Design a protein with these regions (language model features):
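Acidic, Ser/Pro/Thr-rich low-complexity regulatory regions
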Residues: 1-135
Length: 135
């Protein structure tokens, strides 16, 4: 997270998570853009903040893999929609995309007897969160 975001008011992510727990679905690109605008954040800053919050909550045992993975998938779909809307030269937000990839790696059993979440997702998230300790 850059210093510009740290100097801004932190968005009320608790309200987002409360809505998600009550069954609210992130409604896509328009919702993210509206929420970002309401909190004077860029969409990239919001996607990164949400993704880091999900990763932190999952690693702290506050979210199940299924819930965290579902949110990561939704955020990735929004990232892809933005990429299509912006065309050539658009870069996916980091660490949001890396967090999506970490959860994606835990989605399927490779047949080697290991838990893919423990073997792939958790180490990747530890590395990402170590690189972003301010979250």
């Amino acid at each position: 997270m850059n210093s510009e975001m740290r100097n801004r008011e932190t968005p009320d992510l608790e309200s987002v998570f409360a809505d998600l727990r009550s069954g609210y679905q992130l409604s896509g690109r328009e919702w993210v853009h509206g929420f970002a605008d309401a909190h004077s954040l860029s969409v990239v800053e919001l996607l990164n903040a949400l993704s880091l919050a999900v990763a932190n909550r999952f690693m702290a045992g506050e979210m199940t893999f299924e819930d965290a993975d579902g949110i990561a998938n939704t955020l990735c779909a929004i990232m892809m929609d933005d990429a299509v809307a912006h065309g050539d030269g658009f870069e996916l937000p980091e660490p949001a995309f890396a967090i999506y990839e970490a959860f994606d790696a835990g989605e399927w059993d490779r047949g080697d007897g290991s838990d893919p979440v423990e073997r792939y997702t958790m180490p990747a998230l530890r590395m990402i969160l170590d690189e972003h300790p301010e979250t």
